[in-house]
Amino acid sequence: MALKSGLQLYTYKLTGTIATPTAYDLFNYVRDESVDMDRTEVDASSRASVTFRQFVPGLSNGNVETQIMHLPGDTIFDAIQNAFFNNTILLMAFVDGPLQAGDERHGETGTISVSGLWGAFYVTNFTEQRALEDAQVHDIRFSPTLEPVTNAVPEYKTVSVTL
């Protein structure tokens, strides 16, 4: 296993379902990206706790925060923009390797394991940044939801890919 930089990670918009995607569309115009894998804490304290509060894990977050280049006319940019303004869902995969031959950027070959967060997401932030000395970008937040066809929840999974 080798360490990877953010440059070696991949963001895909999927068609089909999470279980059986029919198309993987690689989105190369991503800058920084963070996958928030945290949980709420549920207070389970009682008088039996005596001195310390007791907590159990609650719901996972699963938000993905990213910056994308402002590229009207790009099919994935347009899909993200439309999902925000129309309150529609996108199927996405935020993974550590290519999901199909032809998407390799860093010398990946043979059969590889690819891991990451897969799921259905609403776009809940589409803030346009207009810095004087930087490229025009949008701050995006993908917020997890149930997949409309199967009611599947987002999942962190590993798949085997032959390139």
Regions flagged by a language model, labelled:
Residues P98-A152:
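Short beta-strand and beta-hairpin "edge-sheet" elements
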Residues Q81-N86, V137-R141, E155-L163:
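Short intrinsically disordered coil segments
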Residues V56-G107:
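Structured, beta-strand-rich domain cores
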Residues M1-A2, G6-L7, T150-L163:
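Compositionally biased, intrinsically disordered low-complexity segments enriched in polar/Pro/Gly
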Residues A19-T22, D78, N82, S115, ...:
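Polar/charged alpha-helical tracts
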Residues M1-P72, G119-D139:
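Solvent-exposed edge beta-strands and adjacent loop segments
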Residues L71-T75, P148-V153:
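Short, cysteine-centered beta-strand-loop-beta hairpins and adjacent loop/turn segments enriched
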Residues T22-F27, F77, I89, R105, ...:
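A short, polar/proline- and glycine-enriched secondary-structure boundary/capping micro-motif
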